[in-house]
Amino acid sequence: MKRTFQPKNLIRKRRHGFRSRMATRAGRKILNRRRSLGCKKLCA
């Protein structure tokens, strides 16, 4: 059985990147929460 995590940078950016977060209302909520927490890195 192969492992579940097969790292690929493009897929990582597309799923968890800044633009995909900005695209939905829920994603913007995530960004705002991470800003309020003071995270240096907001997303992938």
From Swiss-Prot:
One matching Pfam family: Ribosomal_L34
GO annotation, cellular component aspect: ribonucleoprotein complex; ribosome
InterPro entries, A to Z: Ribosomal_bL34, Ribosomal_bL34_CS
GO biological process entries: translation
GO molecular function, one term: structural constituent of ribosome
Key words of the record: Ribonucleoprotein, Ribosomal protein
Family per record: Belongs to the bacterial ribosomal protein bL34 family.
Full protein name: Large ribosomal subunit protein bL34
Organism: Wolbachia sp. subsp. Brugia malayi (strain TRS)
